[in-house]
Amino acid sequence: MKHLRQTVLFILLGFLLTACHHTADRLLSIEQLIKLKPDSALSLLRQIQYPEKLSDSNRALYALLMTQVINQSSDEEHKSDSLISVAIDYYKGTTDSVHAALAYYNAGLVAMDNEDSEASLHNFLKTIDWLGESDNDELQFMVRYKMSRLFNLRLIPDEELRLGKAALPYAERTGNPLYICALLPYITHGFMQTNQLDSAYKYSVQAIQLAEKENLVRALSHIYSQHAHLCMAMKDYKQALMYRDKDLAILFELFGEENEYIYDHYINKANTLTELHQYDSAFYYINKAVEDTTDIQYTTRKSLAKAEIYAATGQMDSAYYYMNRHADLRDRLIEERDKEGLLTLHRNYHNDELKKANTRLWQQAVERKLQLYVVTIVCCLAILLGGCIYFFLSLIPQHFDLTLFISS
């Protein structure tokens, strides 16, 4: 009976070990599949039963992969960050910098989806810390690109520009033109908002040329729209209208003429037509942009566009009404975005980075001083030795045959 129990125990143990190895191998296979076929990866992950009963390492990898595949899916939505927290809690206590960086990056994406800017920025900064000098150019690019977008949404153009420029070398090293074309409009916008229009124009033209060459249609819509904004800032309204029409032509082909995504572009065209004194057409497009009170940013822009059209046509009462509405909405928008919290977090991170940099510089200075001391001591010893040799030779009589002295 005792032998039977031992046999059964060994069989169960072997089965469990095999199952553990099988699950680990399966998760590693899914990890390789995510980039190529995220839908298939999601289906395979859902086939894993009782993930909460997996080992700590497998459960962390499962949580990371599930979050990652949901982030890549347009159909799935996050409800909370509890899943990715499992991965972070595990990997932050290990030396696995690859998975730790991925965990924090995906946590940043979840927070971004949930409109929690501070949590998003915190996780992106932790991603950069874990990446260090890693040669993972794609993730190095993506985290800085997402941070640039975050500051774009929060109306902080100097940080949008700084992070966009920091992301560009990594995008270029990946060799993926889509990454470059996605990033360049944010660099352009950062230069525009900091009144560096010549630099903005340079990057905008670069984006247009690359996107047209690679036929990146969806990217071209954003690039054309951004270039039209730039032309407006440079008061080249005819050029701006041309790029507005190019942008809308792409959007009509992709979504049709009546789509909530296009309404914002109608506002942009109305603004351009107002500057060209084509007021009837401006009213036509501003009225095509339907009212959407749930999107404060959209309603703010529409109110300003209406105010400018009414003012240009001498309808000052209506212009005054929409200008006041625009001012109220913009104040509310800035208040809700809580720029100060975001800036404080980023400023603290910069201070920590400066402290680290100063420590490295101090260590380098100490090393240089030590090297200088060593060189000085060696030189002094060499001079002293040379002096001793010279003194010894000076004591020898001039007619003394040194060879005889040595041979003796």
What positions do the PLM features span?
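Bacterial N-terminal signal peptides
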Residues: 9-16
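N-terminal leader/linker segments that initiate helical-solenoid repeat arrays
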Residues: 20-82, 93, 98
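Hydrophobic positions within repeat-based interaction scaffolds
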Residues: 24-42, 50, 78-81, 280-283, ...
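Helix-turn-helix repeat elements of alpha-solenoid scaffolds
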Residues: 33-47, 74-86, 116-126, 156-165, ...
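Amphipathic alpha-helical segments of tetratricopeptide repeats
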Residues: 46-51, 85-92, 125-132, 165-175, ...
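Residue signature of alpha-solenoid helical repeat architecture, marking inter-repeat boundaries
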Residues: 57-60, 98, 138, 178, ...
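TPR/Sel1-like alpha-solenoid repeat signature
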Residues: 63, 100-111, 123, 140-151, ...
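Structural motif corresponding to the intra-repeat A-B loop/turn of tetratricopeptide repeats
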Residues: 73-74, 107, 114, 154, ...
